[in-house]
Amino acid sequence: MYGITSTANSTGNQSYANRLFIYEVVGLGGDGRNENSLVRKSGTTFITVPYARMNQEMQRITKLGGKIVSIRPAEDAAQIVSEGQSSAQASAQSPMASSTKIVHPKTTDTSVPVNIYRPKTPFLGKCIENYELVDEGGSGTVRHVTFDISEGDLRYLEGQSIGIIPPGEDKNGKPHKLRLYSIASTRHGDMEDNKTVSLCVRQLEYQDPESGETVYGVCSTYLCNLPVGTDDVKITGPVGKEMLLPDDEDATVVMLATGTGIAPFRAFLWRMFKEQHEDYKFKGKAWLIFGVPYTANILYKDDFEKMAAENPDNFRLTYAISREQKTADGGKVYVQSRVSEYADELFEMIQKPNTHVYMCGLKGMQPPIDETFTAEAEKRGLNWEEMRRSMKKEHRWHVEVY
């Protein structure tokens, strides 16, 4: 039975480049082709776009002042509506015209949004939420920051990241470079209205080796101190395909996290157990092993424990609290310690073809975890290096460490 513990394939090789998608666009200039055309403030245009040109077309539409309200594979439409039709013609010929609800296709390579907003043309988001996640007695500062993105076309999937460009200049007089942060919300946002994106941000601070002074990270400090209401936060992205949640609603998902590496897994678990959106009903198994220094540093603790209590057959929650717990030989308990403790059970799980393993956080956990699985593989006459290589090829082994 799953619960809380704190003690010791691809289906085909079709060429995606040949697939077509239909963009439903409002407010586009003229027939949607000529950049000098007057912008039409009302009416819907349907544009057929080859997969290979999806990003370029998004940029062109934005430049023309249009807004994409839905994207669908062409084969899903009752019929392809030609470019430049009026809204009246479109509604008479296509069921898509009657709704402006954003369509989020299944997570395949053809539908992963990437670089909708770039550093030279970032989206300006508005901070609508910024609160502390570390309880009294914990170490450091971690904030949950939410942005309103309703005025743009930013779309994302669980497991992706966005970039934040802090204001100001560096010591050389150049604009600060962007920093990437894993998204902590589902594709529908914390409000489940497709209008927000959330981050889990730890304020970076360290001692200068020469002066001994405390140095604070530029972007993390900017975000952690960002006032609610700030409406000019420069956002880029989304980026990333390595950490995407599988579409399989019956999958087994093992998540290994330290600190703010919890961000993508919060998005996963919200989608699995809290959101229960009509487009995804999780029926598989999820196991989160979460490493922190103190109990007070367990981010989103109440929410995770509530989900585990309400879904005991589907969600298992295990903590590794390094400065409060001890291993059998008296050592500190880390994520890799828990993996070693449950090695036999975990290894049996990852041999199943529908099991995905995700690792996010400090890179120090990766080598000992590999050592543990190497030993388990040898017990069974298997080669872990070959197994891991095969899992990566099958998109079942996902690592994002730093």
Curated annotation (Swiss-Prot):
Needed co-factor(s): FAD
Span of domain CpcD-like: 18-74
Catalyzed reactions per annotation: 2 reduced [2Fe-2S]-[ferredoxin] + NADP(+) + H(+) = 2 oxidized [2Fe-2S]-[ferredoxin] + NADPH
Binding positions for FAD per the UniProt entry: 179-182, 200-202, 206, 218-220, 260
Signal sequence segment: none
Any one Pfam family match given in the protein's UniProt record, by short name: CpcD
The protein's Enzyme Commission number: 1.18.1.2
Molecular function GO terms recorded: ferredoxin-NADP+ reductase activity
Membrane topology value: Peripheral membrane protein
Composition bias type Low complexity, residue spans: 85-99
Top class in the EC scheme: oxidoreductase
Subcellular location: Cellular thylakoid membrane
Domain FAD-binding FR-type: 120-245
Region (Disordered) location: 80-101
Keyword NADP attached: yes
UniProt KW keywords: Antenna complex, FAD, Flavoprotein, Membrane, NADP, Oxidoreductase, Phycobilisome, Thylakoid
Disulphide bridges, residue numbers: none
Family: Belongs to the ferredoxin--NADP reductase type 1 family.
Protein name as catalogued: Ferredoxin--NADP reductase
Gene: petH
